[in-house]
Amino acid sequence: KWSSNQLQLYLKSHKIIYNCEINSIKKTTFVCLNKSTMSTEKTIQSALISVFDKTGLEPIVRQLHQQNATIYSTGGTEDFIKNLGIPVIAVEDVTSYPSILGGRVKTLHPKVFGGILNRQDNATDVAQMKEYDIPQIDLVIVDLYPFEKTVASGANEADVIEKIDIGGISLIRAAAKNFKDTVIVPSVDEYELFLEMILAGNGATTIEQRKYLASKAFHVSSHYDAAIFNYFNNEDAIFKVSIANGQSLRYGENPHQKGFFFGDFDAMFTKLH
């Protein structure tokens, strides 16, 4: 854990928070748990949720329901929310199109992406939202199909191809692009952090928090696409690497420098004893 002073210095230097009052916090959690902030806050009034991994999703859904947010969903996620006894609107009811092509096309529709990408301070966008009856979507929660795990399992090519997420990756990129107005939670790894944000902010997020989550979103999308490229690439002398969760070292090449290790340290050596 970091001390309050250490945490505030780090977060202020990265423009994530201002005037934060915290006793201590986990080192991996970079979010202000105090509502005092210099930025404009946006309250979440609507959410689109479409996830593969639902671990830890329930408390988020319950919190959104408690703050009277409208929840849109599809497929298995929609069933999950219904089973919690929480009202949910099917995306198909918004688009007037069913899930088609064996589930390959569910959320790819202007009424979905218009709700995510509209600029709320742009008069033309506001007018078109009204003209085409597009619902506002303040929050997008996505967890992608497990492409890398499917490849690692030795699955055949047909099964691997079906685990290339199209709608999910599009939702992630759209919401991240419009972080000024839209919150993106791009993977199960960010569920806990996001829940802390809205609990601390009474259902609202700051522009710093939204931009921070957008950076996480583009990491998820770039890592995902790199894995897909490496699977398909059999000829070009190109290999794309994206490694997360670097381990902090005591110091870098010199004592005054910072050092990190990325990768699987155990895989580099053969254990003798």
Predicted feature residues:
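N-terminal glycine-/serine-/threonine-rich phosphate-binding loop
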Residues: 38-91
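General beta-strand structural signal in soluble alpha/beta enzymes
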Residues: 49, 70-75, 89-93, 118, ...
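Glycine-rich nucleotide/cofactor/substrate-binding loop typically near the N-terminus or early
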Residues: 76-146
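A short, charged helix-loop
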Residues: 139-162, 166-205, 267-272
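Internal gly/pro-rich beta-alpha loop/helix module
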Residues: 163-164, 182-246
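Long, structured protein-protein interaction/assembly regions in large complexes
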Residues: 236-273
